[in-house]
Each structure stands twice: as structure tokens, then as C-alpha cells.
């Protein structure tokens, strides 16, 4: 995905990389999860005050201000929390095919798509762990 900053406006364009107050869409079909996490970390290093992001579920009070670094951090934390919850289930011995419907992240329960998409997000992250990322990126 293309990310850029308009320095004189202190505005970043981050599109689908951050979707405030919303879990990842469906199975996140075209995302390399590890690279997404890395990219969100790099976005946090950019110099901007507000960002243009897609599929926002910001409240009427928040919407005029657009996305912020707080939203970037929340998106990144969601991915980290999801991965952590999956590993915790593995450690408990939960069968792999039960993990997506067992994982719960109550801190995100108010996010749009939580009930419908969280299990699909979990499947996607698990597949990334088991099979490697898509699209594949060569090392070095």
C-alpha cells in the first residue's frame, strides 16, 4: 500500500492500513500480516497530525479530526493482541480448528465487525503463522 505525508499540511495518507474502530475486514485477503504490523510501526515514526484512512467508523465527534497516530497504534495493537491470543490458545492445547471461535478480545468488542469478522481474522493470522505470509516476500 502507498503511504505518504504532505509535510506542509502535516497530513498522511494511509488508506486501508488503518480502519478506526473496526476489526479487519473478513479474512483480510490481500494483507501480509507481518508486513502490515511492521508498516504500522513505520507510520508511527512519520511526522503528521492527521491521516486519511478508509472504512472509518469514527464517531460524529471524532470524524472531522480524521485518523490520528492513536488510531494507528490501536490498529497495530489489535493485530498484536490477536496474535497473542492465538498463541495463548495454542499453549493451552486448544485444537487449531477451534481457536478462531475461541479467541476473544473483549477490549475490541465494540468495534464494528467484531462478532462477524474476528474469527475470520483469527483464521487469517493463523494461516500466516502456519504457512507463511501472502504475498510472499523474499528475505534480504
Residue ranges and their predicted role:
Residues 5, 33-94, 98:
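Divalent-metal (often Zn2+) His-rich catalytic cores of metallo-beta-lactamase-fold enzymes
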Residues 91-140:
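C-terminal regulatory/interaction regions
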Residues 9-16, 50, 130-139:
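Metallo-beta-lactamase
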Amino acid at each position: 500500500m502507498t503511504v505518504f505525508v504532505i509535510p506542509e499540511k502535516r497530513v498522511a495518507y494511509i488508506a486501508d492500513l488503518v480502519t478506526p474502530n473496526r476489526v479487519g475486514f473478513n479474512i483480510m485477503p490481500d494483507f501480509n500480516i507481518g508486513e502490515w504490523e511492521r508498516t504500522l510501526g513505520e507510520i508511527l515514526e512519520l511526522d503528521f497530525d492527521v491521516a486519511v484512512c478508509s472504512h472509518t467508523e469514527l464517531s460524529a465527534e471524532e470524524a472531522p479530526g480524521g485518523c490520528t497516530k492513536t488510531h494507528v497504534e490501536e490498529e497495530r495493537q489489535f493485530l498484536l493482541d490477536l496474535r497473542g491470543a492465538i498463541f495463548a490458545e495454542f499453549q493451552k492445547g486448544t485444537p487449531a480448528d477451534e481457536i478462531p471461535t475461541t479467541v476473544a478480545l473483549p477490549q475490541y468488542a465494540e468495534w464494528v465487525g467484531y462478532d462477524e469478522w474476528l474469527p475470520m481474522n483469527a483464521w487469517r493470522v493463523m494461516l500466516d503463522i502456519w504457512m507463511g505470509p501472502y504475498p510472499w516476500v523474499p528475505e534480504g
